[in-house]
Amino acid sequence: MNINLTLIGQAIAFAFFVAFCMKFVWPPLINAISERQRKIADGLNAAEKAKADLADAQAQVKQELDAAKAQAAQLIEQANRRAAQLIEEARTQAAAEGERIRQQAKEAVDQEINSAREELRQQVAALAVTGAEKILNQQVDAEAHNAMLSQLAAKL
């Protein structure tokens, strides 16, 4: 294989081409590749940060959800206690009202009994006076009669 002038010319042209590429083509390509690597690295870092933020947010949501559940359970328990208290108060009031009604009924019955006794005493007294008049066949003094009847009624 002979080295001739064409081969030397091609070698010089290739050297100029390599120098031209290293001077004008290679730096923008390296800069573009470096910029792309930086953007990819920034994107990966942002993704990692977002993943960490998501994990923190999920933990916070779980914590707040647990707190809300606990608060809801506490409110339900408090409502149940209040309902039981209201039921007990209603029972107490109903018992007191029943006792009051029973007492009023007892007083009304006692009053009716006393009224009936008084009426019966008056009827017995009137019958006694009528019987005494028939036996004695004379009119008894009304004031003396009333006094005797009052004493008799007091004894009954």
Swiss-Prot record:
Topology in the lipid bilayer: Single-pass membrane protein
InterPro entries per the UniProt record, alphabetical: ATP_synth_B-like_membr_sf, ATP_synth_b/b'su_bac/chlpt, ATP_synth_F0_bsu_bac, ATP_synthase_B_chain
Localization terms from the record: Cell inner membrane
GO cellular component, one term: proton-transporting ATP synthase complex
Top-level division of the source organism's lineage: Bacteria
Keywords assigned by UniProt, alphabetized: ATP synthesis, Cell inner membrane, Cell membrane, CF(0), Hydrogen ion transport, Ion transport, Membrane, Transmembrane, Transmembrane helix, Transport
Residue intervals passing through the bilayer: 5-25
Keyword Cytoplasm in record: no
CDD domains: ATP-synt_Fo_b
SUPFAM superfamilies cross-referenced by the UniProt entry: F1F0 ATP synthase subunit B, membrane domain
Cross-referenced Pfam families: ATP-synt_B
One annotated GO molecular function: proton-transporting ATP synthase activity, rotational mechanism
Binding partners and assembly: F-type ATPases have 2 components, F(1) - the catalytic core - and F(0) - the membrane proton channel. F(1) has five subunits: alpha(3), beta(3), gamma(1), delta(1), epsilon(1). F(0) has three main subunits: a(1), b(2) and c(10-14). The alpha and beta chains form an alternating ring which encloses part of the gamma chain. F(1) is attached to F(0) by a central stalk formed by the gamma and epsilon chains, while a peripheral stalk is formed by the delta and b chains.
Protein function: F(1)F(0) ATP synthase produces ATP from ADP in the presence of a proton or sodium gradient. F-type ATPases consist of two structural domains, F(1) containing the extramembraneous catalytic core and F(0) containing the membrane proton channel, linked together by a central stalk and a peripheral stalk. During catalysis, ATP synthesis in the catalytic domain of F(1) is coupled via a rotary mechanism of the central stalk subunits to proton translocation. Component of the F(0) channel, it forms part of the peripheral stalk, linking F(1) to F(0).
Family: Belongs to the ATPase B chain family.
Protein name as catalogued: ATP synthase subunit b
Organism: Acinetobacter baumannii (strain ATCC 17978 / DSM 105126 / CIP 53.77 / LMG 1025 / NCDC KC755 / 5377)
Lineage: Bacteria, Pseudomonadati, Pseudomonadota, Gammaproteobacteria, Moraxellales
Gene: atpF
